[in-house]
């Protein structure tokens, strides 16, 4: 087959449809982009896709946004990421991976060397999950873009992400938010670690926060903080 891109976004293919797609991925060698966002693929579908990824060598971009996936599905996908060498872009946003799912993804990031873009926004990851991802960022050298917004990561989670950037040489695009005034004092001491970033988006810090942190994100005369 010569098909390289397949977009099934919001087509209600369900678990059975996802399993059928997974079976195809096991033998297909041409598809590079697959969008299965908002399809209610359920646990069986997600696990089947993850299993297929372990042997697939062509897929570069995979979107699994909004499929009501939980920690078990995240664990399965993380297992695939530990052995898959081709996936570069993975969208797991708007699911319910929770902190346990974040733990699994973090473990995968410590050994994965191909993923460059990861979306984990709106996954109820919270503070402990953020700390795990931060630890992974200290050793991961491939990730360039990370969307971590809307996860209620708190001061400790935010500070952990900030501190990890001092060790990470590759990340240049980071989306976080919900950094409120009580967190600003705690984050101020880490603002110098943000120097590698070219983009810091979705930071809900307001005018006070801009005065504290804003200057840290002006790189080569380009200020890219988005204040909502």
Model-predicted regions and their roles:
Residues 1-228:
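Leucine-rich tandem repeat or coiled-coil scaffolds
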């Amino acid at each position: 087959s010569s098909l390289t891109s397949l977009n099934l976004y919001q087509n209600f293919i369900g678990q059975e449809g996802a399993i059928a797609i997974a079976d195809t991925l096991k033998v297909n060698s041409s598809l590079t982009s697959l969008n299965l966002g908002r399809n209610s693929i359920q646990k069986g579908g997600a696990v089947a896709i993850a299993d297929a990824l372990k042997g697939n060598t062509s897929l570069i971009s995979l979107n699994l946004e909004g499929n009501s996936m939980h920690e078990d599905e995240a664990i399965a996908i993380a297992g695939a990421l530990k052995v898959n060498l081709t996936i570069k872009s993975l969208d797991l946003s708007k699911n319910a991976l929770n902190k346990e799912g974040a733990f699994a993804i973090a473990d995968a990031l410590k050994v994965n060397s191909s993923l460059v873009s990861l979306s984990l926004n709106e996954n109820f990851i919270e503070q402990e999950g953020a700390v795990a991802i931060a630890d992974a960022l200290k050793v991961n050298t491939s990730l360039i873009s990370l969307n971590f917004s809307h996860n209620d990561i708190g001061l400790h989670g935010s500070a952990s992400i900030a501190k990890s950037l001092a060790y990470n040489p590759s990340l240049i695009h980071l989306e976080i938010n919900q950094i409120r005034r009580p967190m600003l004092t705690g984050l101020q001491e880490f603002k110098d670690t943000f120097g590698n970033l070219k983009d810091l988006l979705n930071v809900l810090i307001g005018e006070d926060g801009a005065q504290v942190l804003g200057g840290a994100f002006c790189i080569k005369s380009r200020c890219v903080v988005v204040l909502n």
